[in-house]
Amino acid sequence: MAQQTFTGRKRVRKFFGHIREVAEMPNLIEVQKASYDQFLMVDEPVGGRLDEGLQAVFRSVFPISDFSNTSMLEFVRYEFEPPKYDVDECRQRGMTYAAPLKVTLRLIVFDIDEETGARSVKDIKEQDVYMGDIPLMTMNGTFVVNGTERVIVSQMHRSPGVFFDHDKGKTHSSGKLLFAARVIPYRGSWLDIEFDAKDIVFARIDRRRKIPVTSLMFALGLDGEEILSTFYKKIQYKKIKEGWRVPFDSNRFRGYSTINDLIDADTGKVVLEAGKKLTVRAARQLQEKGLKALRLSDEELVGNYLAEDLVNPKTGEIYAEAGEEITEKSLKGLNEQGYKELPLLDIDHVNIGAYIRNTLAADKNMTREDALFDIYRVMRPGEPPTIDSAQNMFQSLFFDSERYDLSAVGRVKMNMRLELDAPDTHRTLRKEDILAVIKTLVGLRDGRGEIDDIDHLGNRRVRSVGELMENQYRIGLLRMERAIKERMSSVDIDTVMPQDLINAKPAAAAVREFFGSSQLSQFMDQTNPLSEITHKRRLSALGPGGLTRERAGFEVRDVHPTHYGRICPIETPEGPNIGLINSLATFARVNKYGFVETPYRRCKDGRVTDEVVYLSAMEEGRYSVAQANVQLDPKGRFVEDLIVCRDGGTRDVVLIPADKVDFMDVSPKQLVSVAAALIPFLENDDANRALMGSNMQRQAVPLVRAEAPFVGTGMEGVVARDSGAAIAARRTGVIDQIDATRIVIRATDDLDPTKSGVDIYRLMKYQRSNQSTCINQRPLVKVGDMVAKGDIIADGPSTDLGELALGRNVLVAFMPWNGYNFEDSILLSERIVKDDVFTSIHIEEFEVMARDTKLGPEEITRDIPNVSEEALKNLDEAGIVYIGAEVRAGDILVGKITPKGESPMTPEEKLLRAIFGEKASDVRDTSLRVPPGVQGTIVEVRVFNRHGVDKDERALAIEREEIERLAKDRDDEQAILDRNVYGRLADLLENRQGIAGPKGFKKDTKITRAVIEEYPKSQWWLFASPNDKLMAEIEAMRKQYDESKKGLEQRFLDKVEKLQRGDELPPGVMKMVKVFVAVKRKIQPGDKMAGRHGNKGVVSKIVPIEDMPFLEDGTHADIVLNPLGVPSRMNVGQILETHLGWACAGLGKRIGQTIDAYYQKQDLKPMRETLRKIYGEDETIKSLNDAELLELARNLKPGVPIATPVFDGAKEADIEEMLKLAGLDASGQSTVYDGRTGDTFDRKVTVGYIYMLKLHHLVDDKIHARSIGPYSLVTQQPLGGKAQFGGQRFGEMEVWALEAYGAAYTLQEMLTVKSDDVAGRTKVYEAIVRGDDTFEAGIPESFNVLVKEMRSLGLNVDLHNSKLATPTSEAAE
């Protein structure tokens, strides 16, 4: 897999995958971006916007009419204005990155004719109305809200539609299965239809009291006969001499037990003797022999049900009603009336049960009105129903599009499940839908059909950002609608404009609330690029309208066969959220209905084509799918005759003939998520450890020097590019200018004359991420380099040459070492600390605000009372710390004084005041100090001033610096623009016939390069040529040039204006200062480290290099791991990685030798030969020139990087071959010597290179100590936790331990003076100050709290102090 990219030529990965990938992996943050773009639709397409997203919300709420229908407010269109601040400015100022929404509304006022009631339009007014700000998504799929980056996580919820289920026999003691159906709309009332233990069918609306389902059908407008004819067939029994003639149908009579002989009605022959059962086969044979009808006696009619009302045609008297059961008595009566034909219901109690007929019989309501009243009473208990109110309420429950919405998805699901064909624009229920649900449910009870599996991904869908936001905005607009209606009715409608009717606060508040406090709007995990990408691809079943942790059972959390290729079976958190929070698989995408789809290659007649089809779980159910690693011949035909497939219908693995296979997986890694796809040899790891491995990669801290893994999977480049950590070129071009903070590229391709030919890429330097890790980008290119579109031009945090690099490759030895690696501890070499291998930079942010208080304004100043000059040495004259100052815990960062309340003065004080004048005692020092445990360097200071407050020196200096930077940007861009435009102009004019030109140009002479360069550039535009086309092009170019120039200047002025304008600060704040401290964290004992295979541990000791075990060539191991950590955990992938990494490093050494040979003999042949042996015939390497080849070899010297994709990677034989190529022992083991004694260890040791990560759990953030500190207000016990500077809890079990030792005095002081005996605490302190060590324990405050609680219950508790008691025993009482 040759990557012909700029970085791909600098370091080539050897690829071990065998399977050719046909499908392109979709962009990894597509889920977020596509969804939100569809919601906003910023640019209005020609012909107007489609009815979706924001447009759909406005369409559904508008038009709004007033109560009397005399006026109407219509929605016309909406548009966005440009955002006030760009993303970076919002981050710095703590603003939300949002664009103002402008909506055009039309107010129509009607005249109403009093006699006819006809409306005529009286007045129409249109106006643009501001409707609040809508947050915009950044390039990387995040939102900036109040200055912090947030991610909206997609939610998995139950798809709208109809679901059939049973109670698994748990409701009733007999264990009978009670079936139920539930119609779930997107919004609106739920409809449940269920059986009870007596097989009567009931309906419930919104989980309220149940009503017989026939009442619901009455309310829908059916009568008893129609209900029966809907659910049952009608059979005509005809009277003949010997009994009744019945048409014979094999399906109906199968399983029929005879009481009397069965007799053919036409021939009179006995078909089946009495007492026998008619089998299915026998029934079919009889039908084939031509049996038309049977003769049944009177007694066999008894127990059947009538299908129609039997009416006397003359008198209109009803003898029997439809659904009535025939008894001997009623049959006798019917015979007497002389009925020759009886229409009966086709109910045999075997294939067709009498459930609906029994429900009809049990139902007390007989008419539509009764049924509507009954439903009204259930929905609104206590209100007396009228026929109109009952009808309106029933209509609005399921048939009103305002109140009920199935959504397109729900309609599609209903159609599929019930085999209906309603269009997906019909979003409410229909009568047919409800009847079809009841029919299907009754069919289930009769044993036809299957119940639904609610964990099937066809029944769960994803709500992404756009949809969640749409629902939220709709809520806001509906709140607004009420206010508008009231206002329209109360004001004089002829004089107002739309603006006066609208208050956009509710809409804006709904959006703000959603982004600020919704459970699905989360603070982005920005530890490293992988954690960002994973966070954006997360699917959560929690959140509003979803599950809760407590209620979610095992089934919901479990892996389901339909997850294959859609949701990762590995990556999910450990703990209470396991299985509720999932990750999207690598190739998965979400379709327009919100179902997760995965790509497959189509197979035709035993041959696999390159056509890629995306299938959802429902569609996949119809096909059989082969795996990606099926053997194919070069033409793409299956080699085997029988192929192992997943059968969609049964969801089992089956063997299928090659020509019957429908689809094949596109890639072996399509079933796992991004994080899991980054683990090499994932297939050799136990699932539990793979889960830990994928979760821990997200916690890896970006290191000072990133290094890509020797053993990768080929996904590293994709993640680095899609996460936005590494910068990719937007257009093909040449590097024009470069420094640490920006890259300027002159575009050479797709030069649109209307666009600037220059791209400027700003790099982020030492920015703080959400998790306080350091974001720093550095360029990979130099001036004059050619880059293509999409090439990586700068590395970000945790990326190396455009590949994700979360950790470092270190030399590992698997052996015990003096017990220091017992139980997953890790032993490190001092080299790792000395060479800064695992050193990371963390940036802490501290802020201080100067507020306006009641006693006067706070002041940021250097003049602080009672502070030595030494403590102020790092502050400038404004009282703010210098950039570059080294600070440690307790140092002042920003000096601040706060006025304090006047306390009454003593006469002595008054005298001193009078003599020495005003003293600075009326202020107290509230400076910002460095908190404990932090030590570092100041890297940035930002000062924010309220509008109208004078800026101090420091703020002005920062502003001047920023303006200089902006001016430099403008000038550079201008210079490149000039060079570009005038270069193109000269090329166009050169060697043309000139008919005009600047002053002094001879007419009708040739324009040569020399002639052009005589004149200043600004006059070049004056040249003219007879070619009209050329002149038009030059004119267009000039127009574009002037516009660009103007645009540049305008942008510069806008930015300067923003800088000089005051900042928007919270109310009461005059000034705010933010200080950023960079902390360098070297690795130390107590830090957590991990590999990629779930092999985690804590550093136990850092050993001098000379004491570490070493190899025969004198190389010392960097890290020693315990071999016992492997067998029981079954993550063998780490061992394979170790061997392969060992081979990579060995091959790197070989390449290093060829570099040395080149410097001696100036011959590159041995190098090319060595690379050919390693890589085979690699196109990229063949295409390199000598200089590029040398650069490649230098990059490969530490180790040759390889890619071993998941489920398709290097096999044992490949690893052995690599080891042999490197000239190493194929066993992967080496003789190792003890660094302390120099002796060899008794056995050979597995040694190799493993990729280790340093995780975000650093001991510096966790270690904590307290002497005195804050106490809880009520109990007076010390607070807990590091954040509160709390103490260590001495809990119940610890008390038991001291009791067990009989350490009474220690225990007493733990429970009193060291905790909540307030008086005792101060006494102890005084005693210590005096150098004394006697103290007395008093009564703990918590005892008083207990007494007060008992008193509050009305129990008076008194302490009686007996004369004999010692003070300690009194406390014990």
From Swiss-Prot:
* GO MF, one example: DNA-directed RNA polymerase activity
The record ties this protein, via PROSITE patterns, to: RNA_POL_BETA
Enzyme Commission identifier(s): 2.7.7.6
Q: Which Pfam families match?
A: RNA_pol_Rpb2_1, RNA_pol_Rpb2_2, RNA_pol_Rpb2_3, RNA_pol_Rpb2_45, RNA_pol_Rpb2_6, RNA_pol_Rpb2_7
Keyword 4Fe-4S listed? The answer is: no
Q: What class of enzyme is it?
A: transferase
The chemistry this enzyme catalyses reads:
RNA(n) + a ribonucleoside 5'-triphosphate = RNA(n+1) + diphosphate
User: What biological-process terms (Gene Ontology) are attached?
Assistant: DNA-templated transcription
What's in the keyword line of the UniProt record? DNA-directed RNA polymerase, Nucleotidyltransferase, Transcription, Transferase
By its UniProt entry, which Gene3D superfamilies does this protein fall under? 2.40.50.100, 2.40.50.150, 3.90.1100.10, DNA-directed RNA polymerase, beta subunit, external 1 domain (2.30.150.10), DNA-directed RNA polymerase, subunit 2, domain 6 (2.40.270.10), RNA polymerase alpha subunit dimerisation domain (3.90.1800.10), RNA polymerase Rpb2, domain 2 (3.90.1110.10)
Could you state one GO cellular component term attached to this entry? DNA-directed RNA polymerase complex
Keyword Transcription part of the UniProt annotation: yes
Protein origin, superkingdom:
Bacteria
Q: Which InterPro entries match?
A: DNA-dir_RNA_pol_bsu_ext_1_sf, DNA-dir_RNA_pol_bsu_external_1, DNA-dir_RNA_pol_su2, DNA-dir_RNAP_su2_dom, DNA-dir_RNAP_su2_hyb_sf, RNA_pol_bsu_bac, RNA_pol_bsu_CS, RNA_pol_bsu_protrusion
Q: Which purpose does this protein serve, as stated in its record?
A: DNA-dependent RNA polymerase catalyzes the transcription of DNA into RNA using the four ribonucleoside triphosphates as substrates.
How is the quaternary structure described?
The RNAP catalytic core consists of 2 alpha, 1 beta, 1 beta' and 1 omega subunit. When a sigma factor is associated with the core the holoenzyme is formed, which can initiate transcription.
Annotated NCBIfam families: PRK00405.1, rpoB
In which family does this protein belong, per the annotation? Belongs to the RNA polymerase beta chain family.
| The protein, known as | DNA-directed RNA polymerase subunit beta
Supply the source organism for this entry.
Rhodopseudomonas palustris (strain BisB18)
